[in-house]
């Protein structure tokens, strides 16, 4: 009674049938975090790693709530997670026991692969998230028109969030899930509308990077939203800013529609190219579009 054993990184402890190895994993997601590996049953006790939101008695897909958990809880510390994954790769792991969520016993490669994707800030899927706020409905109308343009150009996935009404944590999760993000908001007190301000702050806090980003701004006199949004994301790494910015003066006009058309084309150029290539492969009439100089040789 009263005895304690202080372990260090790499320390081992024999419990008779079980042998434990302790591995420090600072900032995943607390400074003092360590994980424990039981070499007998090949179990990794992963602390906050591989956790998820949700009740254990609810049958649901692991990926969505685990992604939302990762981005919200651990997402800022991708480099630290990458270091932990390198250690995990040296172990024979057959069971993962996180502090939050179900025990993982099958298809562990799937979970580890997702953690590698998330912690390296690599887009998980091709697609476009459009996150917006609207005061009088004009920005919402612009977003609706813009989304239709994206869909018509073959974008494989378009996800839209009204940040004043939808789940902010889900919007944040999807911003990291997909490859491209469009932000649309109004100028507000020489800044941006509060819900958009909150959303972009969360993006920056969680190390948002390696994405293509486009901006749609609205304002009655002197729109500043695009400038403010870009400044807020200025410290984020590997952001590919679209050449086109949509600048709306209160309500959408033809110039704005042309700008949205240009932005949609810029976002969807690779999708358009893929669709054209597929269409050409499936076009049987192409067999008959043969240039001059073709001779038909027959034998008698």
Please provide the spans of the model-predicted regions:
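Short N-terminal or domain-adjacent regulatory/targeting segments
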Residues: 97-124
């Amino acid at each position: 009674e009263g005895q304690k054993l202080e372990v260090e990184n790499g320390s081992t402890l024999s419990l008779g049938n079980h042998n434990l190895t302790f591995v420090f994993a600072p900032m995943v997601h607390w400074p003092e975090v360590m994980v424990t590996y039981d070499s007998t049953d090949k179990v990794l006790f992963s602390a906050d790693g591989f956790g998820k939101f949700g009740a254990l008695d609810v049958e649901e897909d692991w990926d969505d709530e685990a992604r939302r958990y990762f981005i919200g809880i651990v997402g800022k510390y991708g480099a630290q997670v990458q270091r932990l994954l390198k250690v995990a790769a040296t172990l024979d792991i057959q069971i993962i026991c996180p502090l939050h969520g179900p025990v993982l016993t099958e298809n562990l490669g799937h979970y580890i692969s997702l953690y590698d994707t998330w912690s390296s800030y690599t887009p998980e899927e091709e697609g476009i998230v459009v996150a917006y706020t609207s005061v009088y409905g004009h920005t919402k109308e612009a977003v609706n028109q813009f989304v239709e343009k994206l869909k018509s150009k073959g974008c494989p996935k378009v996800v839209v969030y009204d940040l004043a009404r939808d789940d902010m944590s889900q919007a944040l999760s999807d911003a990291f899930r997909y490859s491209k993000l469009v932000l649309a908001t109004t100028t507000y007190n020489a800044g941006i509308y509060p819900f958009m301000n909150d959303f972009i702050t969360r993006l920056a806090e969680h190390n948002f990077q390696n994405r293509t980003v486009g901006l749609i701004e609205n304002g009655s006199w002197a729109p500043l939203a695009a400038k403010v949004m870009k400044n807020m994301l200025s410290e984020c790494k590997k952001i590919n800013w679209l050449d086109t910015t949509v600048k709306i003066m209160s309500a959408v006009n033809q110039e704005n529609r042309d700008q949205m058309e240009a932005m949609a084309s810029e976002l969807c150029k690779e999708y358009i190219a893929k669709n054209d290539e597929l269409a050409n492969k499936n076009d049987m009439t192409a067999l008959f579009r043969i240039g001059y100089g073709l001779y038909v040789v027959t034998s008698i």
